Amino acid sequence: MIIRVILALWLVALSTGCDRTPKADKTVVLANDGIFSADLTDHYALIGRTSGPAELWQLKPRALLHSWKHLEDESGIVHAAISGNERYAITAQRDSIAWWRIADGALLNVWSLPGIGSVSLSHDGLHALIGLPDKAVYFALNQGRTLYAFAHDKAVLTTALDRIGHYALTGSEDSTAKLWDLTNGALIYSWPHHNKLATVALSDDGQYALTNAALSQVFIWKTSTGKVYKDVGPKLLTLSAARFSHDSKYIVTGRTSQRIDLWRVSTGKLEKLWRPKKEDAWRPSAATILSLSFTDNESKIWSIATNGYLQRWKK
């Protein structure tokens, strides 16, 4: 009996006292049954599950604004994105993409595309970068046509666009990340990695690109030179989300192991880390961070994980 009591006390201490990372100042459960895809902005969260509709949530005050599905299809939403100006959103099933207007929830159009692996939405919400089995396409949503096709040897798994509409960044299963010029569709740089790409990101001003391959180093590149500016964190790391601050001074990253890190771009050094809430403190399993966003004049950070927990952190 005494041994059991000691063991119980030790487990409580382990689950509460040993984690001295800062706690979230706000925690909300958006989906009790978990989520598969998500995107965050300052004011909204767009979430998708493996079946059923996508949900657009207003964050302050919290309210479900829209529930979206692609026509009558019950397939799950595998990717989601909100435009930087918060006027439009896109949702992707495995073989179709839908364009939505946030103000009234209207479905603007649906297109069939096979094997969608990633989606990114331009700041104005009028263009999408869509990862496909052997390329990415830069698609004019308001015109319903492809402007550029960006070739890869294998599936494009992760994509990013800068705020000013100058660059597109694609990461592929072929172990390359490629930077593209959106003024003419030309390839600017091709950056080889040792494994398939897990996450890419671009700063708003287009000065910096982040790339990370599975179980590999995180790199920050200068887009003006194509050279590595800083390498970040441990050498064996897999990111599941990344977002630059609007002033490009910081980048916040999320791991598949349910950890959030804040890095200073100029030094590549870790400034702060957080460990988001687990569903069950007694279980070792962790949820993957799906999306991150700076908020409140960049003084705080939103995060959302596959367990459905939306949390806010003080920077």
Task: Identify the residue ranges that each predicted region occupies.
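WD40-repeat beta-propeller superdomains and closely related acidic/aromatic-rich repeat-like regions
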Residues: 2-10, 17-315
